[in-house]
Amino acid sequence: MTDADTLSKLTRINGRYGMFHRLTAEADTGDADFLFSAKDNLVSKDFETTAGSRILEGYHPVFDATPIARMRGAGGMLIGKTNMDEFGFGTFSANSAFEVPKNPFDTDRSCGGSSGGSACAAAVIDDHVSLGVSTGGSICCPASFCGVYGIAPTYGRVSRYGLVDYGNSLDKVGLLAADPAKLGRYMRVIAGRDERDPTSCAQPDFEMTNCRIEAVAVPDEAVENVSADVSRAFESALESLQSMGVEIERVSMPELKYAMPAYYVLAASEASTNLARYVGMRYGKQDGDLTQGFDEYFTSIRSRYFGEEVKRRVLLGTYTRMAGFRDRYYAKALQVRMLIIDAYRKQFRTHDAVLTPTMPFVSPRFEDISEMSPIETYKADCLTVPPNLAGAPHLSCPCGYDENCMPIGMQFVTDHWREDLLLNMAEDWGKSFDVRRPEVLI
């Protein structure tokens, strides 16, 4: 299925786009039925796993994350681990400690993040599927920027065993592909209970149905602050959906504006506890001065090998969990999360899905990203954070292009455990929308 020539092509396109942190050295897939890649925060026994961080450089796991194991069990061959924002902290994959993946439609622009390498691989490698991970938008954002389909399932639908955690109550393993049919095909593979991940054990069985999205709610708040290009593409997509028989209703969901601050409190709080394990002893870098005391040694390792965004979020999360601040911030953020969930549930009583643009703008240039403040970067996630905070399944589909041929996506959100509606929509939309592909080299 692949040979030395194919491996050479993979190496060459990786030099152009930088989507892989590590590529397979095997020139023959043997009996593999399909090829796939995985975000570098899913551990794999034959690839270094770094989660985009120097502090994990040199970490070689002895087991596969459950989603990778299930893909391999279905006949797949893992061809590489994809570049990402360090520990998933970012919107543009520009916070990688290694190589920053480049957008396949314009290499001066971002792939999105934090699963940017996975989206790029899905876009430029023909007949490919990639495992991604979403915490606050890390599947749908890069799917939108790279013009592919991306699905983040219900929280708990796919096992997180073997995932380098960002936020335990937020992380979801999903899929990215240029062919929407692959999302349904491989969601059947990776979904399901796993005794090693208790959060996956309460789910109903994953079943595909013939049910379709027939009515969608479009929140006014979600289209107020998007760019003109995104607005035009989204409105055109609404017209196309109506021609497919989908009923469109404009609604108000004022609760959505509270999702961002609540998300960053919860995500940073959980991240700061998860990252406490990286101290230069059990995983990755272990080159500190062993004559130092524990505090000095840990501080030295973390200061040298954590990136600036990681340090920022650790400090933020530690602050929100401090005595005297926990009730003021963390507990209140949990209450806001329930408000967001209730707001979605209200819409799902009369609609099959909530529909918004995926991102408020097209992929920015790296030179513009470097000028953004942290707050401006965080605000870019305003449309992808709400469904992630609610733990609801969501799908990004390509829906248009700007004057520079940069992709624009739209995001469907359905009720918990209703991935079937999203997967059917992806296939239906794929038959009616003329998707443009970048130069496919493999």
Language model feature labels by segment:
Residues M1-H60, D64-A65, F87-G90, T199-A202, ...:
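Short, well-ordered alpha-helical
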Residues T6, K39, L183, V216, ...:
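Residue-level signal for inorganic ion chemistry
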Residues M19, R196-A202, G245-P254, R345, ...:
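Flexible, glycine/charged-enriched surface loops at secondary-structure junctions
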Residues K39, I190, I248, R277, ...:
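Glycine-rich, small-residue loops and helix-cap segments
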Residues I55-Y59, D171-A178, G317-M322, F412-V413:
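Short, well-ordered beta-strand elements within core beta-sheets of diverse protein domains
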Residues R72-R188, A390-C399, M406-G409:
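Short glycine/serine-rich loop segments
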Residues F98, A262-A268, P407-W417:
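Short basic, glycine-rich beta-strand/loop surfaces that mediate nucleic-acid
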Residues A152-A237, E296, S300, V435-L441:
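A short helix-breaking turn/cap at a secondary-structure junction
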